[in-house]
From Swiss-Prot:
The lineage of its organism: Bacteria, Bacillati, Bacillota, Bacilli, Bacillales. The keyword Ligase applies. Transmembrane segments: none annotated. Pfam families: AMP-binding. It comes from the Bacteria. This is Putative long chain fatty acid-CoA ligase VraA.
């Protein structure tokens, strides 16, 4: 039996009447959750050891029940996004040899052949997740149980108010929300989720339960929470992952929730947690202090000690489906970074790097400076082709202010090289986002090039 099943069973036995799951219209105690899991597992008797099972119910509570029910049958849950098209689901099922699908409590057998049907499954896999993105087929990856149990322990160290409730209003198909849910149920806490993020109804629900609460969000959600201007004394910890929050956002959060600790995480679906920034105590523009026992390498460093970040820890995944990792292998994050006094500084994604006149330009470094300007909501630097320089940088931004190019150029030149200063500025109404709530860089770039912004 998986340890997460043992942990869950412990709290079912100890606290059967404690709330386990809260999703708007559905509330389940630990005892009720246990019965639902058992009944579901009886429906899925045909699932055999290590067979992959796609979870695609429209209601997240059903997917959580089925997640544990599949484990009781010895299968491997595959976390689908309920908004995916039938065509995408068919492609994923065929590509990754997903033998079964569950929707509306019905188990359906898949008859398609796959190139991975003879693959050796890594040890202690608890599910298969999928990378998010706006283009191409999501990549399937193995998440092993030990990596999350280690992550749970690191989380516990950072929660300082004996939080009894864990909130993650994002889709369970995203690693952050699913992680928060399994973490809550493995530690006897109440998990609150939402089918669709609604900050006002979320605040009302947290206030009604009136328990010490930790909330897992992405920066776009943080901004929406700020916009509600609703105080909630129950919120004791805010854990944000996906992008660095600005000083202005931190100050607004501190004003709205003075009792709460703000903990920013940097990590990836593959590597899990890499660094953390507790109440912005790390140096400006750093993404925080490296977690204990996270080893790092900077590959192909330049003269400024900037290199491609690779990490190794007990929290990393077990590889992509078809490309399983060797235990203890290094995970390349795709980020250019440097490290100073155990604090990690990101300068940009490898895929986002712009080469202006032969000089490497990293968008993240420019964006962080722009985000420090009062009145700026979001900033994005993209590279577009240029006959003379190869590429030039373009700044897209949203907010209440109208930036003046000469003033911005003067401001940036004090801290950046000439090649790093964007050649053009464009104010836009809003950004486009990926499924996980991050700015969709490629889509924004294409729309700018095509004159659609």
């Amino acid at each position: 039996m998986k340890k997460i099943m043992e942990y869950l069973q412990h709290y079912i036995n100890q606290y059967p009447h404690r709330l386990a799951l809260v999703f708007e219209d559905r509330h389940l105690t630990y005892g009720e959750l246990s019965k639902e899991i058992y009944q579901a597992s009886m429906r899925y008797k045909e699932v055999k050891l290590n067979e992959k099972v796609g979870l695609m119910d429209d209601h997240p509570v059903n997917n959580i029940i089925n997640y544990f029910a599949v484990h009781q049958r010895g299968g491997i849950p595959c976390i689908f996004n309920h908004q995916w098209s039938n065509e995408r689901i068919h492609q994923l099922v065929k590509s990754y040899d997903i033998q079964w699908l569950i929707k509306d409590n019905h188990l359906t057998l898949n008859h398609d052949d796959s190139i991975y049907n003879d693959e050796v499954i890594p040890r202690n896999v608890i599910h298969i997740g999928f990378t998010s993105g706006t283009t191409g087929l999501p990549k399937a990856f193995y998440r092993n149980e030990h990596s999350w149990i280690v992550s749970f322990k690191e989380n516990e160290k950072l929660l300082q108010h004996c939080e009894e409730t864990i909130v993650a209003p994002g889709p369970l198909s995203h690693s952050l929300s699913l992680y928060a849910c399994i973490y809550a149920l493995s530690t006897g806490k109440t998990f609150i989720g939402q089918k669709n993020f609604n900050p006002l109804s979320l605040m009302r629900l947290i206030n009604q339960l009136n328990k010490a609460t930790a909330i897992f969000v992405v920066p776009t959600m943080v901004q929406q929470l700020i916009s509600t201007q609703r105080h909630c004394s129950s919120i004791k910890s805010i854990l944000s992952s996906g992008a660095k929050l600005t000083l202005q956002q931190f100050q607004q959060i501190s004003t709205l929730y003075p009792q709460a600790n703000l903990i920013e995480f940097f990590g990836t679906s593959e590597a899990s947690f890499i660094s953390y920034n507790f109440n912005q105590s790390s140096p400006a523009h750093s993404v925080g202090k490296l977690f204990p026992h996270v080893e790092t390498r900077l590959l192909n460093q330049d003269d400024d000690a900037v290199g491609l970040l690779a990490v190794r820890s007990e929290m990393v995944f077990s590889g992509y489906v078809g490309q399983s990792n060797q235990e203890g292998s290094w995970i390349k994050t795709g980020d250019f970074a440097y490290i100073k006094n155990q604090h990690l500084f990101l300068v940009g994604r490898e895929s986002d790097r712009i080469i202006v006149g032969g000089i490497n330009v990293y968008p993240t470094a420019i964006e962080s400076l722009i985000m420090d300007i009062e009145g700026i909501d979001e900033a994005l630097v993209i590279g577009i082709p240029h006959a003379k320089f190869g590429e030039i940088a373009i700044l897209l931004y949203s907010g209440k202010v109208q930036l003046n190019y000469r003033q911005i150029k003067s401001f940036l030149m004090k801290q950046l090289s000439r090649q790093e200063v964007p050649s053009k500025l464009k104010k836009i109404d809003h950004m486009i986002y990926t499924e996980s709530g991050k700015i969709a860089r490629k889509e924004m770039k294409n729309k700018f090039i095509n004159g659609e912004l």
